[in-house]
């Protein structure tokens, strides 16, 4: 019985290992997503007003693109009032960049200050090359 459980566990781990991020296509630009704070979610939403294929990253042709991300975060009680509970916000932000290059990796980071979300796009040298503009928020 132990061998069966061990074998089953190893097979499950091996199966999960295949569900990571796909290989980066060198003819495309790759944009990693990273939320800057705990208890948040940053998801790829749209590229040029078309639904993103995978919510974990963007992969785009070289050139100009507008990326839309969905950022979910809690507003802490210290920003609301003394007896308040955290308030969850669900926001979209657009980041436009005119010069994505094939084979390069970019990073899109998001965070919030109180009720206001922010997003920044970085190149491989960690230089800020784009800023997010709000595209609407709602309570979630």
Regions found by a protein language model. Give the residues of each.
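Sec-dependent bacterial lipoprotein signal peptides
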Residues: 1-17
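Short loop/turn and low-complexity linker motifs enriched in small/turn-promoting residues
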Residues: 16-140
